[in-house]
Design a protein with these regions (language model features):
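Asparagine-centered strand-capping/turn motif at beta-strand->loop junctions
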Residues: 55-62
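Low-complexity, acidic Ser/Thr/Pro/Gly-rich terminal tails and inter-domain linkers that flank the onset
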Residues: 18-47
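Hydrophobic core residues within well-ordered beta-strands of beta-rich domains
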Residues: 47-49, 68, 97
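Single-pass alpha-helical membrane anchors
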Residues: 1-21
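Terminal connector regions
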Residues: 107-167
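Intrinsically disordered, low-complexity Pro/Gly/Ser/Thr-rich segments with frequent PxxP/GP/PP motifs
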Residues: 75-124
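Short coil-to-beta strand junction motifs in C2/discoidin
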Residues: 63-69
Length: 167
């Protein structure tokens, strides 16, 4: 009886190990990246930034990814992040999928702590936005901004390297 139980436990452990290694392999073959980080809107509340995350699944198996949380930093200092959602997206084998748009609100009060004389710069920022020149808008602020995201790929935590929006 003990031999049967031992064989069953060894079989279950082996099956579990194979599953974990396969999940790790699929996660390693999956690449994730930020797509088109941009300023979407400028209001009295602050700057509204948007971005998408692209998932490139080069494996033969489908991948489950949670909706990423996008974080905005300046020189490594946390500024704000998108709202976390309990949403899982299945990425089909050998395909590229863009995950829903993430929106981040960067309040003027947060920017005030980073930018001296921000009040004098706001008119130039608004003028740049009205002209449709978001790159110039970020240059007007004079604040280095980076974005990164965190997610779970097949249950394994993933954090992207920071992407400079303005450096």
């Amino acid at each position: 009886m003990n031999k049967v139980l031992g064989i069953a436990l060894a079989g279950a452990a082996l099956y579990g190990l194979v599953r974990i290694l396969r999940m790790q392999n699929v996660s390693d073959l999956t690449t994730l990246s930020l797509v088109n980080p941009r300023v979407h809107q400028v209001t009295l509340a602050g700057l509204f930034l948007r971005t998408e995350v692209a998932v490139n699944n080069t494996s033969q198996d489908s991948v489950k990814v949670t909706k990423p949380v996008v974080t905005l930093t300046s020189k490594g200092k946390f500024l704000t992040q998108s709202v976390a959602e309990n949403k899982t997206i299945e990425i089909l084998p050998l395909s590229v999928t863009q995950i829903d748009t993430n929106e981040i609100v960067l309040n003027w009060s947060v920017l005030t702590s980073l930018v001296s004389n921000l009040l004098q710069r706001i008119p130039a920022v608004v003028a740049s936005f009205k002209k449709g020149n978001s790159r110039n808008l970020l240059t007007q602020l004079g604040v280095p901004l980076e974005m990164y995201f965190t997610t779970y790929v097949n249950g394994l935590f993933y954090q992207s390297p920071p992407t400079k929006i303005l450096g």
